[in-house]
Amino acid sequence: MAFMLSLLMALVLVSYGLGGSLGCYLSENHMLHAQKNLKLLARMNRLSPHSCLQDRKDFGLPRKMVEGSQLQKDQAISVLHEMLQQCFNLFHTERSSAAWDNTLLEQLCTGLHQQLDDLDARLGPLMGQKDSGMGRMGPILTVKKYFQGIHVYLKEKKYSDCAWEVIRVEMMRALSSSTTLQERLKKMGGNLNSP
């Protein structure tokens, strides 16, 4: 359950920036790119999601809040970085280029890359201090497993237009579903260990 909350936390961070004590590390630009990336994903729609209902799949992203998190600040930062990197890797491929409008895809990849650069510049020293920490390995592995499932799905579906549409909707759902967790973080004042 803690791993799934870690994944949800990353989605909150990607969509809305870090709340409370984590927010001081991110620039306004980082948060603007997060919102812009979500809008770009929405604009990338080429097919009606209804035409691809037979291709839907549950990739294991939890739909509701998990209570009682023990997620630490450094875990949240690591998960955010991994989510951004995996998203970038997913959309920055030759097969992805064939599926999407290249202008929108390039803007999305640029926005994700700018977020990664911003995180690296601001959080490099913080992440370097505990980079080998075992506490982050579980949440990071959960993110990698989630994206590995997405890559396997695309390969099984032979990178069809419907498969890419399912993935686009999945990424939209993942980013959009983080609103409740964001509100919880605001109520806790950024303390992820609060009840």
UniProtKB/Swiss-Prot annotation:
PROSITE patterns: INTERFERON_A_B_D (PS00252). GO terms for biological process: defense response to virus; female pregnancy. One of its GO terms (molecular function) is hormone activity. Keywords: Antiviral defense, Cytokine, Disulfide bond, Hormone, Pregnancy, Secreted, Signal. Residues 1-23 form the signal peptide. Gene3D superfamilies: 1.20.1250.10. Its main location: secreted. It is found in: Secreted. Disulfide bonds join 52-162, 87-109. The keyword RNA-binding does not apply. One of its GO terms (cellular component) is extracellular space. SUPFAM superfamilies: 4-helical cytokines. Paracrine hormone primarily responsible for maternal recognition of pregnancy. Interacts with endometrial receptors, probably type I interferon receptors, and blocks estrogen receptor expression, preventing the estrogen-induced increase in oxytocin receptor expression in the endometrium. This results in the suppression of the pulsatile endometrial release of the luteolytic hormone prostaglandin F2-alpha, hindering the regression of the corpus luteum (luteolysis) and therefore a return to ovarian cyclicity. Belongs to the alpha/beta interferon family. IFN-alphaII subfamily. This is Interferon tau. It comes from Giraffa camelopardalis.
